[in-house]
Amino acid sequence: MKPFQGITFCPTAINNEILAKKISKKIIKLGGIFSKDLTRQVNVLVVGSTTNTNKFKFAVKHRFDIIFIDIQAIDDIYQLWLSGENILPDSNTATMTGSTYEMLKILYRRFSFKYLHNFNIFIGRITDTNITSIDSLVRSIKKLGCSSYNYQNFVIKDTSSHNDDDDQGQNGQISIFVTDTLLGARVNAAIEQNIPIVHFKWILDCQKRSALLPYDPYYLLPNIKDLPYDSIGSNSCDCWDKINTTFPTNIDAQSSLQRQQSSSTLTPSLPKTSSLLNKFKPKGEKIWDKAMSLQQHSKTNFSVLGQSPLSINNKQEDLSDNSTLIFKNCAFIIHHIFPGNHRSILTKIVVQNGGKIETSYLSGIYDHSYYIIPSNKALDSFNDLPEIIDDNDGIVTEFFIERCLYYQKLLHPIDLWSKPFLSTIEFQVSSSSKLLHHEFSSSPFLNVTITGFSGVELLHLTKVLNLLKPMGINYVEYLNKSTDILLINLAALPSIPKTHPLWSNEFSDLFTQFCINNNNDDPGDNNRKDFQNNSILRNSMKRKIEYIKKFHSIPVVTPAFIFKLLSAASGENNEIFLNNIKWCIICPRGHKDDFKCKIKKPYYTSISSEKKYQNNDPKIDKTILLKRNNSSLSEHSMKDTKNELLQKIRETDSGRKKRSVSSSIMDVSSERQMPDTKRIKLESLPKNFVPKQIKRTTSWGTIMSENVPTEQPTAISNPEEIPRTEEVSHTQVTYGSIQDKKRTASLEKPMRRQTRNQTKELDS
């Protein structure tokens, strides 16, 4: 049975159509009915951005049987349902009163709308102390969601005028002055600032009605100063006599809801408890709630040691109920890199469960000693971690504390969930192009979806995947055509025998504890059987597997692939194949390289660790550095290696200096000296030597002439006939002297030179 079965929801002040569609889809998936109109069948009114709507005002005045919740409540319940939490009421209680009625009670007690969240309330003088007091009013407005209040000094945070509650539509704070007298300097100052003076009975009536009543005109002190106390605000609601102070449903409505469930099959869920509210939180929160035992109210959140504060709500569940202490005779060293509030939380958890907090690692004194570091910090960022040799001790993350609290026992030996998994963050995952679905998603990241997980494993796996997004692995909540890999819980597949290679490898402890607790035959132990008792999780996993087999063929692997990838990021082997039998359950057909994921490191991390010693000279002998990195050296050999390395560097530096000096000398000498080749001595020409005339084939004046001779004489007919002395002695082409040209011109017939103008006439 779904949690909202038989409950009708109606929205108000949700102007965003996209948001309204999302809310309606979630309500329908949870088994509820979504109605845009406020009809008689409506049980819950979902309030959006403001309470200044006709639906809200009508429901407050006339509908005593309606529960008011906000949008966030729908989102929180939907996330709980997806994660496999038991949000249905207890089976024994539901049998007597009806499951729908009990679900409405949970909505009323846990998720009622905090309608004073945008109010700035100043509490002045209270003359009638027999009815209430300032401390009592402060407690009341805090329960109603008001966080901005003052009863000592009159400080105006919102100087704008507030004549009525219509200003709620502006999403601004509403300032009011609560008192029962019009006398006093503070009251006069509030009147000058146009701040409404409201009788304190308005707060008490809002708490009784479980809704925001209009203070204008029913509670404005100038209007009702002469009225008796019982008559104040009597007209603000028409159903005072029908309101139940514990739950807004009368006997007739309760009977009607019971009849709706008469033919329904109720699902056993939570064990009987005096508080249904505390059972409505995710496992991660309930672990810390039990441990901390604080009285603090907060919204549902999956974070345990994350960014948001812890949500603690009930004092009745405490670790005093446990007969044994989880961390008895265990010592913990909390690294100083943890934030102060996280350190205090871890310290209190460890001490309350029998553990000891030490400042340094002590081996052999306690049964177990653990050094705790943050899960989101890489190991290569630490330089002060101790060297732990004892098998009973180890370096763990805060995941270890959470897992021990979740399973209510000390988990030994330490599994892969609890060990530091992030060795470095300086790497990128490059996947095969055939593995990525670029036609549906342009992202170069590897899109990963999970199924079959619940409880603390679900919490930790999502945290691990979110940490890997900068490295190229993108966690997506839903399975679709853009998904590249499906991570599945091996312990949720009972058809795979324990002798299979999926179980007989170094990653098997990822699923051992989950398998032990969900396969426990004890019928009374239902607290950890989230997957076994939740048909929604099992059906969801089956549907995802069927979808992959029929419509979207992608690899289905266990989280061992992720942990292998993380371990390979610090090693030399930088290629991981998805079709490995250690983690692959379903794999499409294809070549081995089609399922390859390559780990790429930056240059300064991909080269060996000897980079810190090298001086970028390629002639340095690196064998010493490689030996030092690849072998464990004694103290004596390390000194020898150091001296040998320094000697090599000195020799290289001196050799480089000699080469640089010699090269500079050669450069200077080469500039000053002439080439070493002998100059050829030019022979003097005889006095009566007359050079031959060289006839040019054409010139600028004869280029466009038609009388240019077609047969062009060759200046040199045979190169071999030129004397050697003439070839050597001349350095440029000689065209003859002026006298030779005159003598030649007198012997030949003069040729008339064609000009450009004559050429144009010929063309015409």
UniProtKB/Swiss-Prot annotation:
Residues 651-675, 710-764 are annotated as: Disordered. Keywords: Cell cycle, DNA replication, Nucleus, Repeat. GO terms for cellular component: DNA replication preinitiation complex; nucleus; replication fork. Interacts with SLD2. This is DNA replication regulator DPB11. Residues 739-751 have a biased composition (Basic and acidic residues). PROSITE patterns: BRCT. GO terms for biological process: DNA replication checkpoint signaling; DNA replication initiation; double-strand break repair via break-induced replication; mating type switching; mitotic DNA replication checkpoint signaling; mitotic G2 DNA damage checkpoint signaling; recombinational repair; regulation of mitotic DNA replication initiation. Residues 1-99, 129-220, 322-418 form the BRCT domain.
